[in-house]
C-alpha cells in the first residue's frame, strides 16, 4: 500500500502528524499511536500493524 494513501486515510479519521527524520508519527487526541516509515510502498505486514495500532481500516 502506498504511504500517501495510509496518511490520507488516517487524516480522514482525525489523526495529526509530526514529521521526523525518517518517519512520520501519527497522533490522535494528543496521544501517540503509530509511526509510518518513509517508503513509497509500505509492506502488507506493516499495514496490518498500523491498522491494529490505530484502529482504522486501511485496506
Please tell me what each predicted stretch does.
Residues 1-20, 28-59:
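Basic nucleic-acid-binding interfaces
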Residues 24:
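Short aromatic-glycine-enriched beta-strand elements
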Amino acid at each position: 500500500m502506498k504511504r500517501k494513501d495510509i496518511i490520507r486515510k488516517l487524516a480522514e479519521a482525525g489523526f495529526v502528524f509530526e514529521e521526523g527524520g525518517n518517519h512520520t508519527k501519527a497522533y490522535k487526541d494528543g496521544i501517540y499511536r503509530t509511526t509510518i516509515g518513509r517508503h513509497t510502498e509500505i509492506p502488507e505486514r506493516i499495514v496490518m500493524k498500523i491498522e491494529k495500532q490505530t484502529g482504522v481500516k486501511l485496506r
